[in-house]
Amino acid sequence: MTGRVTAFSDKRGVGEITGADGTVYWFHCTRIAGGTRVIDPGTDVEFEVVPGHRGRWEADAITPRS
């Protein structure tokens, strides 16, 4: 799926991606591909949607689009 990072907290290591379908997906910095732990809001990304904690869907395998 494609989307855009709409929020990210360096301090907490968590953020949100708004998918192309308009759904907001939570993510933890460990889900960013390539070993980096930070990503800027506004970055266009590709990601997978996986079942997460508390029954919500979350973003995984997050890769910035070039």
Language model feature labels by segment:
Residues A33-E46:
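Short nucleic-acid-contacting surface segments enriched for D/E, G, S/T with interspersed K/R
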Residues K11-I17:
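Short aromatic-glycine-enriched beta-strand elements
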